[in-house]
Swiss-Prot record:
Species the sequence originates in: Xanthomonas campestris pv. campestris (strain ATCC 33913 / DSM 3586 / NCPPB 528 / LMG 568 / P 25)
Keyword Iron-sulfur: no
NCBIfam families: acyl_carrier, PRK00982.1-2, PRK00982.1-3, PRK00982.1-4, PRK00982.1-5
The protein's name: Acyl carrier protein
Gene Ontology BP annotations: lipid A biosynthetic process
Lineage of source species: Bacteria, Pseudomonadati, Pseudomonadota, Gammaproteobacteria, Lysobacterales
Pfam families xrefs: PP-binding
Underlying gene: acpP
Classification via InterPro entries: ACP, ACP-like_sf, PP-bd_ACP, Ppantetheine_attach_site
Amino acid sequence: MSTIEERVKKIVVEQLGVKEEEVTTSASFVDDLGADSLDTVELVMALEEEFECEIPDEEAEKITSVQQAIDYVKAHVKS
């Protein structure tokens, strides 16, 4: 079983079409990985699907980096 961090990074690579080595925990979706607003919405939807959870819009707006996505999933998803 992959770790949450590995699963989140895999989703980011697939959704944003970036290289795996570019997806560091400190990477910002917009500033570092070139995501636009539609990309970030699709990314949140992919996270919801992967981790079988719902991320409210007000929470989704706060998830702007890889680490924030990992932290959110760890805090809100039962493993």
